[in-house]
A protein has these predicted regions:
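HIT superfamily nucleotide-processing domains
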Residues: 1-109
Length: 109
């Protein structure tokens, strides 16, 4: 199986609009946004989905959520949604764990 697109983005083999990065996670703009502001926060390590987390991955979920919170503050979002899609039936399109940061709506949208 070919390496997934998010692994290639994490290795900087494919360009993306990176908003923040540390040793374990990377956040970048979604190329098919579902909201005025739509970023994906991914672990650099390939993990297929939440359903595939092992005991040694416990800290990665905290790091994904905390990184999304920091990015939302950096973007000055007043409100936002954090969403994990798990499996094809749950709406997951890319088989690499990722957290959607969605926001930027104005009142009434």
């Amino acid at each position: 199986m070919a390496e997934c697109i998010f692994c290639k983005i994490a290795k900087k083999e494919i360009p993306s609009d990176i908003a923040m990065e540390n040793d374990h996670v990377l956040a970048f703009k979604d190329i098919k946004p579902s909201a005025p502001v739509h970023y994906l926060v991914i672990p650099k390590e390939h993990i297929q989905s939440i359903a595939h987390l092992e005991d040694n991955h416990k800290d990665i979920i905290t790091e994904l959520i905390y990184s999304a919170k920091k990015l939302a503050a950096k973007l000055e979002l007043k409100g936002y949604k954090l969403v994990f899609n798990v499996g094809k039936e749950g709406g997951q399109v890319i088989d690499h764990l990722h957290l959607h940061l969605l926001g930027g709506w104005t009142k009434g949208e």
